[in-house]
Amino acid sequence: MRRSTLYSLIFIIILTAFAVWVDLPGSRNVFGRQAEVVEGLDLQGGLQVLLQARHVGGKAPTREQMEEVRQVVEQRVNSLGLTEPVVQLQGSDRIVVELPGVKDPEQAIRTFQGTGLLEFIDAGDTPLQVGTLVNTTLGPAITNGNQNQNSTKNGTPTPGTTPTPESTPQANQTPVAANVTPTPEDPQFQQALQATPPEQLQRTYTTVITGNDIANARPDFDPTTGEPVVSFELKPEAAKKFADFTTQNVGKYLAIALDKKIISSPQIRDPITNGRGVITGVTREEARTLAIQIRSGSLSVPLDIISSNTVGATLGNDSVQRSIRAGLIGIGAVALFMILYYRLPGFVSVVALAIYAAVVFALFKLIPVTLTLAGIAGFILSVGMAVDANVLIFARLKDELRRGRGLIQAIDVGFKNAWPSIRDSNISTLITCAILIWFGSRFGASVIKGFAITLAIGVIVSMFTAIFVTRTLLQVVLSMVHTRNLWIWGIGKNQLPEPEGRTLQPAKSSRTTQA
């Protein structure tokens, strides 16, 4: 065995052992990061929601606005603590949200759908009724844009609140149900509209600070009562502004509005100078939702739900089992064909194929790649393409053996002649994968993107295993199997080369016939 072949074999053994270790069930700590299987929506179950931006004032949102909204939605979704959520733009005014493994779909929808515009407004000498609508200096409660749009029916429970530090008496508020994106077609909006005095809608209230002025917000518990609250801390500039306002308006009312609906209207008993406060009267889930909305910022464009689809985990597990079964049957059939047709090289290709599968699956866990049914299909297709590369190599190998070359020379020449075809076909496939990945990212087609990513990874690894692993294994086998019987190399008796000296060659004349 040549020294280079020995070194290559050692490298393959180490690589295979590492890949198998990563592939073992469970999570592995590799280079400071966790390597684990990330299942997509269709495998572990979850929620898929299609959101559409509302055309306010009859104007469609710009691309920059949609990207800003997508980033805010992504921040809110990431705060849910889910594994590999997907938030993608689809077309010019839609956003696709995929939440694998979400436990409470309704709570998740409330988290990212609401605009989350939190306003602290000057209510003056009269408290505003909880659950009513207000016009503020940041915009009216009713616009032409939301009058012409259909509303979703998913309401957001909205809490009563008290924007006071611990020293300030808390107002006694009752939580009310408030739609996060109220529109006139929504029954909850109609209820809030009917409860709103007409003179209140004719007035514009001054917004003192907004949720964007809050530096941090978190769900918490009142140390005295043990009730859930949202604790917040204002940014330095806003804290000074808030302190000046509360100092000048002691005895008056400061209302809090979420998406133009009043959720609290406490009286200012003392100046609030420390820039800290709490929002009370919330449930545990409502506190979490409101804190996420405050931290991520408000949406510049309201969003409506076009469709939502919940995938059960049972369906996902059944799909996984069927996909694995189909893949094993397909790989087994291919392995049997390779061994029967190519014999010893076919057996070597099966070993290389097993190494290929181990390396690819390890990469899926290390990157990580979110596995979906389409992604599994892409992986199975890449297995077929890996076998196709071996078929090309072995066909060239048999051609060289038929021409009477020795085994070592036939292997070298066979791989050299097969490489251009393997390279060109795989590059064409990778270009197609790049187009599919772009298409999936641009139009929110995560299924297509997942298929293309797994296929591309498989194709890249297949070029390595076909050229490097298979060639090394063949050279190792050749050094161990000392036989001149070409049958085990896939050459039948009727395909053997003619014995040397038995072939007829045309005679070459060195003389020139002259007329």
Curated annotation (Swiss-Prot):
Predominant location category: membrane
Annotated Gene Ontology cellular component terms: plasma membrane
UniProt entry tagged with the keyword Protein transport: yes
Biased composition (Polar residues): 170-186
Keyword Transmembrane included in the entry's annotation: yes
Single GO molecular function: protein-transporting ATPase activity
Membrane topology note: Multi-pass membrane protein
Pfam families associated with the record: SecD_1st (PF21760), SecD_SecF_C (PF02355), SecDF_P1_head (PF22599)
Keywords tagged on the record: Cell membrane, Membrane, Protein transport, Translocation, Transmembrane, Transmembrane helix, Transport
Residue ranges with Low complexity bias: 150-169
Subcellular location: Cell membrane
Disordered, as annotated region: 141-186
Membrane-crossing segments per the record: 6-26, 322-342, 344-364, 367-387, 427-447, 450-470
UniProt record, GO biological process: intracellular protein transmembrane transport; protein targeting; protein transport by the Sec complex
Highest taxon, organism lineage: Bacteria
Its biological purpose: Part of the Sec protein translocase complex. Interacts with the SecYEG preprotein conducting channel. SecDF uses the proton motive force (PMF) to complete protein translocation after the ATP-dependent function of SecA.
HAMAP family per the UniProt record, alphabetical: SecD_B
Entry similarity comment: Belongs to the SecD/SecF family. SecD subfamily.
Subunit and partners: Forms a complex with SecF. Part of the essential Sec protein translocation apparatus which comprises SecA, SecYEG and auxiliary proteins SecDF. Other proteins may also be involved.
Protein name: Protein translocase subunit SecD
